[in-house]
């Protein structure tokens, strides 16, 4: 997490708590000449457009008061969607028995990307049930090899 996203998280977490929203992700990026602060929120039962609008207004107030970002930026508050990122420890535990997609720094069994059902999580690794051709098998992936993980929609 960058210094800016850490500062933003510290500022907006109390606001989101008051609104009963969970902070899923913060991303501060430059695209072309524009900067974007993207904040993903969620709550029990999911968020709708009205929830995102309310959160955006409250976050804007706090950001304007404290001004942690020196350049102009666009604020985007949205739902994390069906393929929400899995970043925090609790995200992995909440994803047990759900389909996930994992991208790795280095290949395991010849592949750097795995799609399957998360079966278990511990401090060192995750276990996924994956399909390989017509067979189902379980693989263990060390946590330190995971570059990115997200929920997945399997059809």
Curated annotation (Swiss-Prot):
Any one GO biological process: translation
Keywords, alphabetical: Cytoplasm, Ribosome biogenesis
Stated name of the protein: Ribosome maturation factor RimP
UniProt source species: Staphylococcus epidermidis (strain ATCC 35984 / DSM 28319 / BCRC 17069 / CCUG 31568 / BM 3577 / RP62A)
Family stated for the protein in its record: Belongs to the RimP family.
Functional description taken from the UniProt entry: Required for maturation of 30S ribosomal subunits.
Entry GO CC: cytosol
Chief location category: cytoplasm
């Amino acid at each position: 997490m960058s210094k800016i996203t850490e500062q933003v998280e510290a500022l907006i977490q109390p606001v989101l708590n008051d609104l009963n929203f969970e902070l899923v992700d913060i991303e501060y990026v430059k695209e072309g000449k524009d900067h974007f602060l993207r904040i993903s929120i969620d709550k029990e039962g999911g968020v709708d457009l009205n929830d995102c609008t309310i959160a955006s207004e409250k976050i804007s107030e706090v950001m304007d008061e404290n001004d942690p970002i020196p350049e102009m930026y666009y604020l985007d508050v949205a739902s994390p969607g069906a393929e929400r990122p899995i970043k925090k420890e609790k995200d992995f535990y909440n994803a047990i028995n759900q389909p996930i997609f994992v991208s790795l720094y280095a290949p395991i069994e010849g592949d750097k990307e795995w799609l399957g059902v998360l079966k278990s999580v511990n401090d060192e690794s995750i276990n996924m049930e994956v399909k390989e051709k017509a067979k189902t098998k379980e693989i263990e992936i060390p946590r330190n090899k995971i570059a990115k993980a997200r929920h997945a929609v399997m059809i």
